[in-house]
A protein has these predicted regions:
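Strand-loop microenvironment adjacent to phosphate/nucleotide-handling motifs in alpha/beta enzyme folds
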Residues: 1-174
Length: 174
């Protein structure tokens, strides 16, 4: 779905708050990029996608190129009337520092809107359809039954069982 500008989970209000407190601005990684859309675009995506297809389709707004989070942070610092505090600031406390916190578990440096290359256009010029493969519910029930029947599974046995399920579901699709 992308990052919705101005929403409660958006990085923009967080950066604004961090700047208003004098910094630092926290960023996970210097090369991190994300896609953004406005609240209006997100609302329109939901409405338009609902009118285009059926319930099994996955739709994504064409949001253009990803945005560098570091560049966004720097721009917000400058637009707020501050300067960027760097290691060359020599003790000058007048700038806003950027600190890198590291990626959280499961977080990626570059956001992906699609998995794979199965992307097609729709009747709406800004909405794309992703043809994603997913397994049948019967396969999910099968693995759940296997998991329920196995008491006190070791982490390794659980990993092997889930890996086998992933391999089996891939072969059944092809």
């Amino acid at each position: 779905f992308g990052n919705v500008l101005g929403s409660s989970g958006s990085v923009i209000p967080l950066f604004q708050q961090q700047i208003s407190f004098g910094g630092p601005i926290t960023i996970t990684h210097p090369e991190a990029t994300r896609y953004f859309m406005t609240i209006s675009e997100a609302s329109q995506l939901v409405i338009q996608a609902g009118s285009i297809g059926n319930t099994c389709n996955v739709y994504v707004l064409n949001m253009g190129n990803p945005v560098s989070i570091l560049a966004l942070a720097k721009q917000m610092i400058y637009l707020s009337g501050h300067i960027l505090k760097t290691s060359e600031s020599n003790g000058d406390d007048s700038g806003i520092e950027i600190q890198y916190t590291g990626l959280q578990q499961g977080e990626k440096i570059h956001e992906e809107l699609f998995i794979g290359d199965n992307i097609t256009s729709t009747e709406h010029p800004m909405i794309l359809e992703a043809t994603e493969s997913f397994c049948e519910w019967s396969m999910v029930e099968e693995i759940l039954d296997q998991l329920k029947s196995q008491h006190n599974l070791s982490a390794e046995k659980l990993r092997q069982l889930l890996l086998q399920f992933a391999v089996d579901s891939t072969h059944k699709e092809n």
